[in-house]
Amino acid sequence: MSGHRFQALEYEPAFLSLGEQYWDKVQAATFPQHILRFRNDALLPLMGLDPAEVTDADFIAAFGQFQGREPFLAMRYHGYQFGEYNPHLGDGRGFLYGQFRGVDGQLYDLGTKGSGTTPYSRGGDGRLTLKGGVREVLASELLHRLGVRTFRSLSLVETGESLWRGDEPSPTRSSVLVRLGRSHIRFGTFERLHYLRRPDLIQRLLDHVIAYYYPHLLEIPDPKERNCAFYRELVARTADLAAQWLVAGFCHGVLNTDNMAITGESFDYGPYAFLERYDLGFTAASFDYYGRYAYGNQPAICAWNLEKLQIPLSWVIPLEEMAAALKTFGDRCQTTYLKLMLKRLGWADLPLELGRSLVVETQAFLSRSLISYPQFFISLRQEFSPEWAADVGHLFSGSPTLTPADQKLLEAWKRCYFERLQQATPPQRVAIPQTLRAANPLVIVTRPHIEQIWQAIDQEDDWSRFRATLELMQV
C-alpha cells in the first residue's frame, strides 16, 4: 500500500487502551469507486498538516480506501430511543478511525459514517447515501459557523455503489463521511455498562473521560468530588448546547441518549432541519409522531437524557449530588440562550436585564409573522446602520417583502430595538455591525435549499451550489 499524509499523524490509542469490553475490531468495506466530493482544508492545520501539501489522493487513500490504519473500532453502546430503552445498539455503519492530538494539545476523534457493516448493523448495509453525506456536511459547517459546538466534516468520498432506501428515491448514490470531534463516547456508552451491571467498567470509563476531556478536574484530589464535578460540568455543557441549537434555529431530530456526546457536542443529527419559520412545535423527523424531539422541546429532552444518565453514574456518584446539579440546567440554558440571541441581534455585551425584553419581542415577532427565521437575521445584518439610532423610522426601511400584517407586528419590535439603541453608548452602537457579521452568516440551509443543492448534484452532477453555499458560510 502506498503511503499518504494522514499516516504521518501520531495516532493515540486512547479508546483502544480501555479494553475490548468497550469496542469491537472491524474492517472497512471495499468500494468500487472513490471520488472526493468535499475536503475541509480548514481543519488540517489543527491536525498539524499543511493544506497545500495534502492532495486529494491523500484523502482518498485514507478515507475512501482506508490504507494503513488499523485497528478500526466499532464502539458499543445502548440508549433510550423515543423514551424506550434499547440494548441492541452500537456503531452500525461506521467506526472510530483513529485518535490524535491536535496542535492545541487536545485529543480528537476521527470517525467514519458509511464505511461498511459491523456487528451492530442490525441487518443494514452499513452504507451512507451521498445525499445523507451532503446534508451532514452542510449542517456541521453551518452549525460551526453559527457558534454551535459540533463535530465537523473532514471529508466526503463518493463510493460508486447503488443503495436502496425507503425514505428517498432509490437507487441512490453512496458515500463515506469522515467526521472530526472531541469524542464519540455517548450517554449510551455508560448505559450499556449499567445494563451489564459492571460498575468497575463505568468507573474506568469515567476516569478515561475525565482524564482526556475534563483534565482540569484532575486537580481535585478527592475522586468522589471529582466525579461530582464532572456531572455538574456536563450539565452546564449540555445546557449551553441546547441553547445554542435554539438560537441557531436548529432541530436535531433524534435526541436519543445514544446521540448525546459526553463532551457536549452536536452529532448524529441525521433527520435534522434548520427552521424556516420560528415554530417551537416544529419536528424534524417524520417518524416523531408526537413531537417528542420538537425544536422547542430540545432543552427538556436534554435534561431528561441527563437524568437517565444518572442511573449508570449512580454507581460512582451520589444521586442527590446529580439531582442538585440537574436543577441548575434550566437557568443555565435560559441565560446562555439570552446571551447568544442578543449577539444575533447585534449586542455582544448588553446586560441581560436590559436585553431580555428585546429577545422576548423578537420571539413574539418571529412566532406570529410569516418571515423566515434565518432571513430575519440576514436582513438585520445587511440593513443595520448606526443611523437607526436617530429615528425609529429608519429601522428595516428597506424590507418591502413583509406583508402589511407582518409590517404591523414589526413595529413593536422596532420600537424595542430603537429604545436599546437610544440607551447604548456610541462605542456600543459602532460595535453592532461587527457583532451582526460574526453571528449571522449570509446563508440559508433549510430543507428547500438543501433539496435544490441535491437536485443539481443528483440530476446533473453539478456541485457548484454545494460549494457556493459552503463558501458563503465564511462571509
Curated annotation (Swiss-Prot):
EC class: transferase
EC number: 2.7.7.-, 2.7.7.108
GO molecular function, one term: magnesium ion binding
Domain of life: Bacteria
Catalysed reactions, as listed in the record: L-seryl-[protein] + ATP = 3-O-(5'-adenylyl)-L-seryl-[protein] + diphosphate; L-threonyl-[protein] + ATP = 3-O-(5'-adenylyl)-L-threonyl-[protein] + diphosphate; L-tyrosyl-[protein] + ATP = O-(5'-adenylyl)-L-tyrosyl-[protein] + diphosphate; L-histidyl-[protein] + UTP = N(tele)-(5'-uridylyl)-L-histidyl-[protein] + diphosphate
InterPro entries cross-referenced by the UniProt entry: SelO (IPR003846)
Binding-site list for ATP: 90, 92-93, 113, 125-126, 179, 186, 268
Record: active site: 258 (proton acceptor)
Cofactor(s) this protein cannot do without: Mg(2+); Mn(2+)
Keywords: ATP-binding, Magnesium, Manganese, Metal-binding, Nucleotide-binding, Nucleotidyltransferase, Transferase
Residue sites binding Mg(2+) per the record: 259, 268
Main function: Nucleotidyltransferase involved in the post-translational modification of proteins. It can catalyze the addition of adenosine monophosphate (AMP) or uridine monophosphate (UMP) to a protein, resulting in modifications known as AMPylation and UMPylation.
Stored NCBIfam families: PRK00029.1
Similarity annotation: Belongs to the SELO family.
The protein's name in its UniProt record: Protein nucleotidyltransferase YdiU
Species in which this protein is naturally found: Thermosynechococcus vestitus (strain NIES-2133 / IAM M-273 / BP-1)
Gene behind the chain: ydiU
